[in-house]
Amino acid sequence: MIELLKKIFLVDLFQGLFVTFRNQNPKYIYTEQYPAERPKVAERYRGAPRLNINPDNGETLCISCNLCALACPENLIVVTSERSEVTKRKELVTFTYDTSRCMFCGLCEDACPVDALELTQDFEMASYTREGQIWDRQALEEGPRPTQYKC
């Protein structure tokens, strides 16, 4: 009879809820207001890639050495270049970076001799399509554009 009353009045449920609420102190509960307030990320966080440009002339710093593509364990960086007739240097033609396969290890950033490739602290890289995750040279130079929400 006692077991039946315990099942009817949900005694076990209330005992479990008591244990849960006893260990939750409301003054320690913290909720981030994410879209309105951007969270602070760690200083060494590696996020969205960016191709740096020279502020003096607006050209990319990439010298098309292909070391970043060779250092990448996922083979997601594709660099193509052509030799210039005038300067006799390799000039960057295309640079693609597949962020959907990237594990953000930073080996490509370390391999770059001129610091042209950088992993920034931007973390908003969501896309509705797989093609949106493959960034070309223009997207890498501009960097991700975080959505500004108004509350």
From Swiss-Prot:
Cofactor (UniProt): [4Fe-4S] cluster
Positions contributing to [4Fe-4S] cluster 1 binding: 62, 65, 68, 112
Record carries keyword Iron-sulfur: yes
Keywords from the UniProt entry: 4Fe-4S, Cell inner membrane, Cell membrane, Iron, Iron-sulfur, Membrane, Metal-binding, NAD, Quinone, Repeat, Translocase, Ubiquinone
UniProt superkingdom: Bacteria
EC number: 7.1.1.-
Swiss-Prot/TrEMBL catalytic activity: a quinone + NADH + 5 H(+)(in) = a quinol + NAD(+) + 4 H(+)(out)
Membrane topology summary: Peripheral membrane protein
Cofactor note: Binds 2 [4Fe-4S] clusters per subunit.
Residue ranges crossing the lipid bilayer per the database entry: none
Pfam families: Fer4_7 (PF12838)
This protein's record includes keyword Cell wall biogenesis/degradation: no
Every 4Fe-4S ferredoxin-type domain range: 49-82, 93-122
Residues the entry annotates as binding [4Fe-4S] cluster 2: 72, 102, 105, 108
UniProt-annotated location(s): Cell inner membrane
One of the record's GO cellular component terms: plasma membrane
GO molecular function annotation: 4 iron, 4 sulfur cluster binding; iron ion binding; NADH:ubiquinone reductase (non-electrogenic) activity; quinone binding
Protein family according to the UniProt entry: Belongs to the complex I 23 kDa subunit family.
Its job: NDH-1 shuttles electrons from NADH, via FMN and iron-sulfur (Fe-S) centers, to quinones in the respiratory chain. The immediate electron acceptor for the enzyme in this species is believed to be ubiquinone. Couples the redox reaction to proton translocation (for every two electrons transferred, four hydrogen ions are translocated across the cytoplasmic membrane), and thus conserves the redox energy in a proton gradient.
Subunit structure: NDH-1 is composed of 14 different subunits. Subunits NuoA, H, J, K, L, M, N constitute the membrane sector of the complex.
Matches recorded under HAMAP family: NDH1_NuoI
NCBIfam families assigned: NuoI
Identification of the protein by name: NADH-quinone oxidoreductase subunit I 2
Native species: Solibacter usitatus (strain Ellin6076)
Gene symbol of the encoding locus: nuoI2
